[in-house]
């Protein structure tokens, strides 16, 4: 009940545990704290989505181990490619479950951008990863939706990014249903 009380509800369908208003050190919480929060959230909700900081903390391992799937967002630039390869090497060196990572390209090329698609393919091959998901650029629509505190599905229901997120959500829901049936 304490966790749900700390969350901000949206139309009683979505509950969000927002980031603290003050900047706090990443080592303020421990891996066991994170694990307990995830367990409580799993008992309360059908799906738990965690947005992690850009830097790895001691408790990042707990999130990776407790997650069913871990999306690593990247963009089509050299810095993101270097960070992806660093992440891959770090996880493999520590024997962490790298196979849980699903790489998602943010601001992916448009449907007709063949040059962009070939760059994505070359990037994936050179990094030795699969880019499982390509999210289109949401542009101002996403910014405006976030500024108004509204989900993209309500403020911009026909946006291409919203449709891709919906496809992803449906596929994750199917995986969840199949896992529940198997158990």
Positions of PLM-derived features:
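Phosphate-binding/switch loop-helix module in NTP-utilizing enzymes
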Residues: 17-60
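G-domain G4 guanine-recognition motif of GTPases
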Residues: 74-76, 101-115, 134-141, 157
């Amino acid at each position: 009940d304490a966790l749900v009380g700390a969350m901000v509800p949206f139309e009683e369908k979505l509950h969000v545990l927002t980031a603290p208003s003050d900047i706090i050190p990443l080592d303020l919480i421990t891996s066991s704290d994170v694990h307990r929060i995830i367990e409580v959230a799993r008992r309360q909700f059908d799906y738990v989505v965690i947005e992690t900081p850009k830097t790895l903390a001691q408790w990042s391992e707990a999130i990776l181990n407790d997650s069913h799937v871990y999306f690593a967002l990247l963009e089509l630039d050299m810095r993101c490619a270097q960070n992806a390869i660093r992440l891959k090497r770090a996880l493999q060196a520590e024997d962490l479950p790298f196979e849980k990572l699903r790489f998602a390209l943010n601001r992916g090329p448009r449907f007709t951008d063949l040059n962009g698609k070939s760059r994505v393919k070359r990037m994936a091959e050179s990094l030795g990863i699969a880019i499982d998901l390509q999210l289109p650029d949401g542009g101002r629509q996403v910014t405006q939706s976030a500024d108004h505190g509204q989900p993209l599905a309500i403020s911009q229901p026909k946006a291409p990014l919203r449709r891709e997120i919906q496809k992803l959500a449906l596929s994750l829901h199917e995986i969840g249903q199949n896992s529940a049936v198997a158990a």
